[in-house]
Structures are given as C-alpha cells and as structure tokens.
C-alpha cells in the first residue's frame, strides 16, 4: 500500500539522478520532469509451486522508494498513454534504458513516462550522487535474521544482495503504483492528465522482472482487481523468468 508521495524539490545544486531535464532540456520540448519519494508497505513473497505461483512470506514491510515522472506541460497534449519503466539496476546504478531508447517517440506523441527504482542495490550510488536527496531511501529487510536460501547461494545469486535490504518488496510497489496512476486520488502525480492505457516496460534484467511480474503476480485476483493492472507489456532484451 502506498501511503504517501512527496515531491522532491529541484534546485541548481540538487536534481534527479540521470535527469532528462538536465541533459535533454525537456522543458524546451514542452515536458516537465518531477521526482517523488514513494512511502508505503509491501508484502514479501516466496515461491509456492513450480508454475510460478507465490504466497506471502512477510506482510506489510515498510519502505521508502522513488519514482520519476516525465509528462507534457500542457495536460491537453497528453496522449492518454502511461509508460511505467522498471529502471534497470544491473550496473549498480539506475539506467532508464527504455526511456533512452524511446524518449523521442514519447515526447512526440505526448506520452507520460514513469520510472520506478526497482532494486535497492542502486541506492548506494544515488546516495553517493546526492546524499541529502537520496539518503532516506530504504528497502530494509524485515527478516534480517533469516539466511539466504541454499539454492540462491549455489546458483551464485548473491553478487548484488545483502541482508540489509529486501529486493522482494518490489512486486507490491509496482502493483500499487499502477493502480495509483489509474485512479483519481489527490496523491496521484498524473491525476490531471487523461489516462487511457498503462503499460509496463523494462530492459534486460528489468525485462526479466517484467516476465516474473506477468507470470506470478499480474493475474492474481488481488492484483488484477477484476480488470488488468497493466494494459500491455514490452520487454527489451530480457530473458525468461
């Protein structure tokens, strides 16, 4: 559950990591870029069967994450398309690869872009970039005394993991963000825009996240809510998950 969004102010000294405004002058192209802290709670899941089913392992763990929104300055010029990107974390820093590849079309068509931090291994680099701006980000592990599984250790999956944080918080973050963007709550940062379709995208490791979300979460009744949490999915360079 997302409890609150808080816009992060931009100054000459403090601005978003990999800011498109700074490097592409989005404001001169009729777009605005805003960054938000996203506060909430999320469940942590574990595998329930060999077909990708999951069940809750730990409920309601608190987190502080961040999103970045790029949208037309003029709400009337919005296409109604909202593209949510699972920002790629593979290099231990944030790379919004699908934005990099598609921004010209997004801006030309009037699409809204929303990028979400997808893995806490990137927080250290963001804090190094601007500690005051990003120091409050937290994906704290709600069960730090539980060791990593033997399977994870054997398969070599510990390279960018540690007991201080919990990567599994992401799935509920993504679901709750999608429904927030669809709704008309006051805290929805794009509530003034037309929103007809909400899409999910990601590149490489983030594409694999997309596959996992689609296979294990998107069609769970509490996620789909009798409809579709996302209207479409586009993975770039992903592998099966």
Q: What label would you give each PLM region?
A:
Residues 196-241:
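Primarily recognizes the serine-hydrolase "nucleophile elbow" in alpha/beta-hydrolase
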Residues 113-178:
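Cap/lid segment of the alpha/beta-hydrolase catalytic domain
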Residues 73, 77-78, 153-204, 224:
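Gly/Ser-rich "nucleophile elbow"/oxyanion-hole loop immediately N-terminal to the catalytic nucleophile
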Residues 96-114:
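Short amphipathic alpha-helix adjacent to the substrate-entry channel of hydrolases
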Residues 48-54, 78-79, 93-98, 116-118, ...:
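Short, solvent-exposed loop/turn and secondary-structure capping segments
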Residues 1-100:
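Catalytic-loop region of hydrolases
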Residues 36-38, 81-85, 112-117, 199-202, ...:
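Structural recognition of the beta-strand scaffold that forms the well-ordered cores
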Residues 31, 59-65, 94-95, 159-179, ...:
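Phosphate/oxyanion-binding active-site loops and adjacent basic polyanion-contact surfaces
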């Amino acid at each position: 559950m997302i409890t609150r969004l808080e816009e992060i102010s931009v100054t000459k000294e403090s601005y978003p990591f990999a800011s498109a405004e700074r490097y592409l002058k989005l404001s001169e192209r009729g777009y605005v870029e805003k960054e938000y802290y996203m506060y909430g709670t999320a469940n942590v899941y574990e595998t329930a069967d060999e077909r990708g089913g999951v069940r809750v392992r730990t409920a309601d763990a608190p987190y502080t994450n961040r999103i970045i929104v790029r949208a037309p300055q003029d709400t009337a010029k919005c296409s109604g398309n909202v593209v949510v990107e699972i920002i790629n974390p593979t290099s231990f820093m944030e790379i919004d690869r699908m934005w990099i590849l598609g921004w010209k079309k997004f801006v030309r068509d009037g699409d809204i872009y929303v990028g979400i931090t997808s893995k806490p291994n990137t927080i250290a680099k963001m804090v190094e970039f601007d500690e005051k701006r990003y120091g409050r980000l937290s994906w704290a592990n709600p069960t730090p005394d539980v060791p990593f599984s033997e399977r994870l250790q054997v398969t070599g999956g510990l390279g960018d993991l540690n007991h201080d944080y919990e990567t599994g918080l992401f799935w509920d973050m993504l679901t709750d963000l999608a429904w927030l963007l669809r709704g008309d709550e006051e805290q929805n940062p794009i509530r003034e825009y037309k929103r007809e379709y909400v899409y999910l995208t990601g590149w490489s490791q983030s594409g694999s996240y997309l596959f996992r979300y689609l296979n294990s979460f998107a069609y769970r009744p509490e996620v789909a809510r009798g409809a579709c949490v996302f209207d479409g999915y586009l993975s770039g360079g992903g592998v099966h998950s």
